[in-house]
Amino acid sequence: MSPIGTVAAVWRTLASSLLPVGLLLAVASCGSETTDNPDPGTAFSLVDEDCPGEAVPTRLTVSCHRLHLDHGTLGVAVLWAEDPTGLPVLHLHGGPGGRAVADRYRWLVPRSQVLEGHDVVLVDQRGGGTSTPSLDCPELDDPATPPGEAIQACRYRLDQKGVDRGSVTVGSTAADLVHLRRSLGIDAWHLHGVSSGTRIALELLRIDGSSVASAVLDSPTPPEVDLYDDLPEGVLYALTSMENLCRADATCPGGLVGPLRSILDDLADRPVAVTIWSGEASAYDDARLIRLVADALAAPAGLNVVDGAVALAAEGRLAEAIAALNEVASTGRSVGDPTSEGARLSSECADELPFNDADPMLTGDPILDAVARGEVKVRALCAVWQVERSPDIVNWPMVSDVPTLILSGHLDPITPTAWARRLADRLGNAVLVESERWAHAPSMSDPCAAHLVARFLDGERPLSGFARC
């Protein structure tokens, strides 16, 4: 039994012998308490706390904690398997600036197969979720405020509070998780990284690889790939893959890529003010629309929405198209949403953008150019945010022989399949599984991908190639 599983067993025994059933269920679904908490003011101490939000109905014990570090605190949740047979699993959420603790229900309802044999550790990485200080930017809530002005206001507020905006980087986040592992008394664990969380996982392999038994990299972002430079071709590949599917299914007789090119070409010359559900008018140019299309296609339901939305836009019904895309796109903003915009900016502006071409090349293809113009907008925001560039090592390729499962979907416009293939070629003990029907982060939404992850963490090694379940 793993160290963390041993602690869980002790807690279960004490709870069942000392607590009434009602209190036992409360402990199991929210925060479990112990009497030997370290001093909350001590650096690198882990203390218990109530779980945030509503309790999630489950038979499993779920405990929540706060890891106190020298820069602030991290929110942590542990989902305790009833009878763990393998090492614990650290889940690394995407973003940057995402969250995991408030989204623990995604593991519990329905219960993930991983929890049949493994405890799962969830952590809100620095700057996001319930971790402190938060780099969330509620200033972005007002759609009438230009993004640059909103980011400037957020920066000013954080600076007035003494928050170090440059503290959220790949390197610092990975170092936090080494402290978390030690604080939990874990000698070795599995990693499950999703999207940008895969980059944190790769950094953990670099700095703490002897403590990693295996890694699952779902929709990976390899450090050596210049993400912004490569993304236009990746978005086009995902859209072309979707067009191939919808033509085969006879759901887009008019095509997808051609009509979208025409729409984007018009918006590049003449942005359109669209009235959104709140009644506010919002301007859409080609860069903003392609980002919304990509966000929608990346979502689990995107395959069923994007082709219809493009058809609506091609008919001149842009507002209806945008409303349909917004229904499925993951475009959360500030308080209570899944994304801390400041944490995302800090990491992107320090870890990624400086290593990309400062002057994106326009090709004349409306899709490629719309994506490239999005990078120009991010650079403008980084100029406002102003954080230092990370050391060059953050951009070096990772080499490891740790057993690794890589998952990639051909419909993923956020982390294209080409990146996964490149990473698989470099890692010495990796299996790459692809699917033409997966989009972004399939292990969190697709039953086949989730099953492959659970089997891999239990020691089974799937065959490389297309998913066979």
Q: How should these model regions be labeled?
A:
Residues 27-29:
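C-terminal motif of bacterial Sec signal peptides marking the signal peptidase cleavage site
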Residues 295-311, 315, 354-359:
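Short helix-capping/linker segments at secondary-structure and domain boundaries
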Residues 319-352, 357:
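Long, low-complexity segments enriched in small/aliphatic residues
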Residues 272-291, 297-302, 334-342:
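Structural motif
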Residues 2-19:
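Bacterial N-terminal signal peptides that target proteins for export
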Residues 221-239, 308-311, 318-332:
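Flexible "cap/lid" loop of the alpha/beta hydrolase fold
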Residues 31-33:
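Bacterial signal peptide processing site
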Residues 36-287, 346-348, 352-469:
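Gly/Pro-rich cap/lid or specificity-loop segments adjacent to the active site
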